[in-house]
């Protein structure tokens, strides 16, 4: 039941089936990419330089909390480099043959996107090393004493990998990425621009204060902002005249129990448990997860990043600690 609650959570930053319409409003080029100014400027330079040399872009690792646009950036890289995007994920690549099939189908300049790369098995990693370094694929032919290794040349390609947990990558894999980019939570101004752009593409009339109200409650995350926009659009259609202003957006999000800080019942429950059961901490993440009937990964990837970024919780060597700001504002 807890897992279902997390999946159905409106401000869950993880991608779900309901987010499929977002594909139609994602930026396709760096010029359309909003926010992340450091990442955008660096990628513009790296991509232009690689294109001028007629080379594949260096392998690129993108990490950060979910919902910030790692997949979008991978698509942009492929489009800017003029190559095809081949997508997969760490959990899907179970056998060596799975990765070998993808690598041998690549063409020069293509981008291979591997999401959740921290979940690759050691066997798959070993195949990736020569593919990334030398554009070669080492495969075994035959079995037993007659087995032999052969090398296949691969066309120059770019591996773009995404992860929410960069610390779980092995050093040999991490060191093979020439470009490493960290995506940060978005500020309200950039999210307001993202929401306004999405509303325009969805043909939803919206005022500036309506966009600001949605952005303020979107937890610094574009995926959540777009999801909230769709629900506010529904509310405006039924309870208003179809247009979104600050009052309509505020009423809609209040109805959905997303407060002005972007927090919902699970955030407040986390804070209350840490305060009441663990006296404000320090408390181990496993203990907090057990008290919430959630798994550790869910807390670390979904609930905690925003609470920590906003200054409500500290992650220390001894465990999680509630800050005075959280006590003053929420308890």
Swiss-Prot record:
Positions annotated to bind DNA: 296, 315, 320
Superkingdom of source: Bacteria
Keywords per UniProt: ATP-binding, Cytoplasm, DNA damage, DNA recombination, DNA repair, DNA-binding, Hydrolase, Nucleotide-binding
Molecular function terms, GO-annotated: ATP binding; ATP hydrolysis activity; four-way junction DNA binding; four-way junction helicase activity
Catalytic activity: ATP + H2O = ADP + phosphate + H(+)
EC numbers: 3.6.4.-
Chain segments carrying region Small ATPAse domain (RuvB-S): 187-257
GO annotation, biological process: DNA recombination; DNA repair
Region entry Large ATPase domain (RuvB-L), spans: 1-186
Ligand binding (ATP): 25-26, 67, 70-72, 133-135, 176, 186, 223
Region feature (Head domain (RuvB-H)): 260-331
GO cellular component: cytoplasm; Holliday junction resolvase complex
Entry-linked InterPro entries: AAA+_ATPase, AAA_lid_4, DNA_helicase_Holl-junc_RuvB, P-loop_NTPase, RuvB-like_N, RuvB_C, WH-like_DNA-bd_sf, WH_DNA-bd_sf
Binding positions for Mg(2+) per the UniProt entry: 71
Entry annotated with the keyword DNA-binding: yes
Location in or out of the cell: Cytoplasm
Function according to Swiss-Prot or TrEMBL: The RuvA-RuvB-RuvC complex processes Holliday junction (HJ) DNA during genetic recombination and DNA repair, while the RuvA-RuvB complex plays an important role in the rescue of blocked DNA replication forks via replication fork reversal (RFR). RuvA specifically binds to HJ cruciform DNA, conferring on it an open structure. The RuvB hexamer acts as an ATP-dependent pump, pulling dsDNA into and through the RuvAB complex. RuvB forms 2 homohexamers on either side of HJ DNA bound by 1 or 2 RuvA tetramers; 4 subunits per hexamer contact DNA at a time.
PANTHER family: HOLLIDAY JUNCTION BRANCH MIGRATION COMPLEX SUBUNIT RUVB (PTHR42848:SF1), PTHR42848
Record text on subunit structure and interactions: Homohexamer. Forms an RuvA(8)-RuvB(12)-Holliday junction (HJ) complex. HJ DNA is sandwiched between 2 RuvA tetramers; dsDNA enters through RuvA and exits via RuvB. An RuvB hexamer assembles on each DNA strand where it exits the tetramer. Each RuvB hexamer is contacted by two RuvA subunits (via domain III) on 2 adjacent RuvB subunits; this complex drives branch migration. In the full resolvosome a probable DNA-RuvA(4)-RuvB(12)-RuvC(2) complex forms which resolves the HJ.
NCBIfam families, alphabetized: PRK00080.1, ruvB
Protein name: Holliday junction branch migration complex subunit RuvB
Native source species: Psychrobacter cryohalolentis (strain ATCC BAA-1226 / DSM 17306 / VKM B-2378 / K5)
Gene name for this UniProt entry: ruvB
